[in-house]
Amino acid sequence: MEKISRTKIVDLLKRRDFGAMVNVKGWVRTRRGSKQVNFIALNDGSTINNVQIVVDLANFDEEMLKQITTGACISVNGELTESIGSGQAAEVQARGIEVLGTCDNTYPLQKKGHTMEFLREIAHLRPRTNTFGAVFRIRHNMAIAIHKFFHERGFFYFHTPIITASDCEGAGQMFQVTTKNLYDLKKDENGAIIYDDDFFGKQASLTVSGQLEGELAATALGAIYTFGPTFRAENSNTPRHLAEFWMIEPEVAFNDITDNMDLAEDFIKYCVQWALDNCYDDVKFLNDMFDKGLIERLQGVLKEEFVRLPYTEGIKILEEAVVKGHKFEFPVYWGVDLASEHERYLVEEHFKRPVILTDYPKEIKAFYMKQNEDGKTVRAMDVLFPKIGEIIGGSEREADYDKLMTRIQELGIPMKDMWWYLDTRKFGSCPHSGFGLGFERLLLFVTGMTNIRDVIPFPRTPRNAEF
């Protein structure tokens, strides 16, 4: 076959130089036709849209054509022509076809509907479906938007360690990292494992957050963000939890809680606008196939100012809802860590727009959050979204050395793990704020998917680490 430079299908479908000879490569989605002419729907992953290849059967070897089945990979030389059918403006009249890879008849992605559960079992193949092709192209574009947003605002991208000795959230649900022989663990007289002879000379884990290290950078570089994988060993088999996921964590020197809320709202709106501007075909496909209100919901976020609501006021609204007969599975009272059903009631039923909940009780939030003058609450903020619940968690950080030290001692956090963090309050402490956004939570909102396992290529969940 004549050598012609390949054109990606996303670019080919925009061309109008009909009569030009082109080359496309991709995977066969469908093949149909008559005894004289076949029509092949070809996709190369660059777009949700297929290009139609028109094949005059008289011009091609019958044995070669038998190899062109759903899933086969082919290279096509042909003439770009104006399509007479509806759906797209251009198609390719095949002049030469090369089969690059045949597809066994056990190929599981045939032309029929597949359940999400089934597709999770074949995660190595599901990017070839329309749905997951769309999701993963959107995922790429959201990552680009994140870097672009922060770069345009003078933030520095800061890399924090994956292996750490600190537990930022204090949850203790961390994956251990060790080179020790698990069948011959040395223990002290109290039964605790001795790590002195381990690789790092101490107990080490996979990070649950890059925040603490990010704070160190913010107190030197001014404004930074992290974007990387994090790990939580929570035994939670829900549509909202993963053991391995990606986090975006900006930290900004001299920002107070109001600045932090402004940044969070601007950031989310930027990402949503980017999706609509750069991934519209994919978003439209997901809107039409799975969630008829997706585009309307995305556009609604851009139009509305986020409600800013103190936790105490939120509790009052929820208590009033209970009095009026609304049934919650979990109880509502001041001091409770709100469940997803509470968050979604505030967003979806009461305000009908995103809510930033602030000033949470000190006892249900992390040690590093700045305490309010009432002594009971901290300058925390959670951004709550429709269908998702919490999408961002953040706070103004405690900048006072003595208050931070007292809180660390109250919670029994070992000083040997925190001395370096306290140094930032000892040497030129400054007000600063930040937040964490779960990348996959953002993707749930932008794609309309209902299970977080469907917005990451290879989900890691309890008892599941395939591929």
Swiss-Prot record:
Cellular component terms, GO, for this chain's entry? cytoplasm
The enzyme's E.C. designation: 6.1.1.22
Q: Which reaction does it catalyse?
A: tRNA(Asn) + L-asparagine + ATP = L-asparaginyl-tRNA(Asn) + AMP + diphosphate + H(+)
Q: Which CDD domains match?
A: AsxRS_core, EcAsnRS_like_N
Presence of the UniProt keyword Signal in the record? no
GO BP terms in the entry:
asparaginyl-tRNA aminoacylation
> What's a Pfam family this protein contains?
tRNA_anti-codon
Question: Which is one GO molecular function term here?
Answer: asparagine-tRNA ligase activity
Main EC class of this protein? ligase
Query: In which compartments does the protein localize?
Result: Cytoplasm
Mark the transmembrane ranges: none
Q: Where primarily located?
A: cytoplasm
Please give the family membership noted in the entry.
Belongs to the class-II aminoacyl-tRNA synthetase family.
Q: What is this protein called?
A: Asparagine--tRNA ligase
Task: Specify the species.
Answer: Phocaeicola vulgatus (strain ATCC 8482 / DSM 1447 / JCM 5826 / CCUG 4940 / NBRC 14291 / NCTC 11154) (Bacteroides vulgatus)
Q: Which gene encodes it?
A: asnS
